């Protein structure tokens, strides 16, 4: 009897071990640089939140790799210059089994358009005059003015109408339509998602410091590391036999921004001098180690609204000194206040730019701020110059949001208060143009104008660097750094 009990106990222990091993095999831990601010698609303001929202929710439309819009939850037809009809697919369901219906679409967009909701997406949707539900599967959008590319603006995740009307205190969605569902999310704890098709668990663990994240990856505490991976750390991690990496050409656009309302930065000659003084080739080679490419405009040439063969400023410190001497005939250096984040790699970049500008007679004073404070001050216009990146730009309406004179905060993202009659004309002409080829040509003219006037100094497009443990299979990212490949990611059996 004693031997029999020992045998039963041993069998139970083996079963428990295998069950635990199987559970761990089906759990993948993803190291991210910051925790999401919200999983509610109406309020996404940061890249991590937007990428996670795309796992939890589905939208009426989605974007292909070329950033052209295609149907997702619904097909659409244009019934008139001011009238679009969306028909929801029969197979569109929330994870609780309820169908996605027109009232869900209506409730989601109505709430975004409510000024009291303070959704950051309201500016891109103000052209909507009315939303009408025709039946459970059909919803009509009526516009204030013609917009031939209106569907581009409808990539926001659809929420159940019941959630919109009675939201919980935390973004724990009782029903969502995406390929993943939220299991748990509490303060200072990982976000835990479950993949709907097979129940596999994915933990998203926020580790701000890239060195700490690297150590967690090496120790096996996380399986995937993506976002704010410095190139030198990426290269070092790839030396380990238990890790491998992927580098994907990205569209993260880094730039220098300026306050154009007054002071030295309002002088286009000064901005031209700064552009000629920055040796981007050296920065890309020695700091980025080849993981970024020179940028001349907001979108890369592969984007339909981008442009080939943009020839802007060159590295020419001699010309820069001549312009500076013309602006400032005294021997006293021009002082330029520059704001950047606490990210150590961004500080290294700032230090190199500071040194390059010093050689042409500009004394750049660097102010380091945490990201929230930095964004707050820039949004208020409390800066002379700064460096930031636009992440995941997709739609051509960003030209209006960033460069139109009527798009200053809070109405848009023209933080430097750039005002150009010609830029406004080109943006408005492009928005009215129904022919894609002609619209692209208008945006190309706009990009040449922006290179002349330099409200921004474009710097580079940064690649997305991902490092994984060797047993992680079928994960990659795309041009805007999305996590959508997690739909098929697995851990291999040993």
Please describe what each predicted stretch is.
Residues 145-203, 209-212, 318, 322:
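Gly/Pro-rich hinge or "lid" segments in bacterial periplasmic/extracellular proteins
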Residues 189, 194-235, 363-365:
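Ligand-site clamp/hinge motif
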Residues 5, 121-164:
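Surface-exposed binding/hinge segments that line
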Residues 29, 101-108, 136-140, 179, ...:
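Alpha-helical secondary-structure segments
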Residues 365-374, 401-470:
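Extracytoplasmic/peripheral linker and loop segments enriched in polar/acidic and small residues
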Residues 31-81, 87, 110, 175-176:
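N-terminal lobe/hinge region of extracytoplasmic solute-binding protein
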């Amino acid at each position: 009897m004693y031997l029999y009990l020992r045998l039963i106990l041993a069998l139970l222990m083996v079963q428990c071990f295998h069950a635990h091993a199987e559970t761990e095999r089906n759990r993948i831990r993803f190291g991210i640089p910051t925790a999401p601010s919200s999983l509610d698609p109406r309020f996404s303001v940061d890249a991590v939140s937007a990428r996670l929202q795309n796992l939890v929710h589905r939208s009426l439309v989605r974007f292909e790799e070329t950033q052209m819009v295609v149907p997702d939850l619904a097909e659409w037809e244009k019934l008139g210059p001011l009238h679009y009809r969306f028909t929801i697919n029969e197979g569109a369901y929330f994870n609780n089994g309820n169908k996605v219906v027109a009232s869900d679409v209506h409730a989601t967009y109505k709430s975004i358009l409510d000024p009291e909701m303070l959704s950051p997406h309201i500016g891109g949707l103000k052209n909507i005059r009315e939303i009408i539900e025709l039946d459970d599967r059909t919803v009509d959008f009526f516009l204030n003015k013609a917009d031939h590319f209106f569907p581009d603006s409808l990539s926001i995740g659809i929420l159940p109408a019941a959630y919109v009307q009675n939201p919980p205190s935390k973004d724990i969605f009782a029903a969502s339509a995406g390929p993943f569902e939220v299991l748990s999310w509490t303060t200072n704890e990982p976000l835990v998602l479950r993949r709907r098709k097979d129940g596999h668990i994915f933990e998203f663990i926020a580790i701000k410091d890239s060195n700490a994240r690297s150590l967690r990856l090496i120790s096996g505490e996380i399986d995937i590391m993506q976002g704010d991976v410095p190139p030198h750390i990426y290269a070092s991690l790839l030396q380990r036999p238990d890790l491998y990496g992927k580098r994907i050409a990205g569209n993260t656009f880094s730039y220098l921004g300026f306050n154009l309302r007054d002071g030295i930065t309002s002088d286009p000659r000064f901005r031209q001098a700064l552009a000629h003084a920055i040796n981007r080739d050296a920065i890309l080679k020695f700091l980025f180690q080849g993981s970024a490419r020179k940028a001349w405009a907001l979108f890369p040439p592969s984007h339909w609204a981008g442009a080939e063969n943009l020839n802007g400023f060159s590295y020419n410190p001699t010309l820069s000194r001549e312009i500076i001497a013309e602006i400032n005939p005294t021997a006293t250096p021009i002082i330029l206040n520059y704001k950047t984040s606490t990210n150590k790699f961004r500080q290294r970049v700032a230090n190199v730019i500071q040194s390059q500008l010093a050689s042409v007679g500009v004394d750049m004073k660097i102010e380091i701020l945490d990201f929230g404070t930095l964004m707050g001050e820039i949004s208020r216009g409390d800066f002379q110059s700064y460096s930031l990146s636009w992440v995941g730009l997709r739609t051509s309406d960003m030209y209006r949001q960033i460069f139109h004179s009527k798009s200053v905060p809070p109405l848009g993202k023209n933080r430097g208060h750039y005002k150009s009659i010609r830029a406004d004309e080109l943006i408005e002409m492009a928005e009215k143009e129904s022919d894609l080829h002609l619209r692209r040509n208008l945006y190309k003219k706009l990009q040449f104008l922006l290179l002349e006037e330099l409200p921004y100094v474009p710097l580079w497009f940064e690649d997305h660097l991902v490092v994984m443990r060797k047993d992680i299979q079928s994960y990659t990212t795309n041009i805007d750094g999305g996590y959508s490949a997690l739909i098929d990611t697995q851990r291999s059996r040993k």
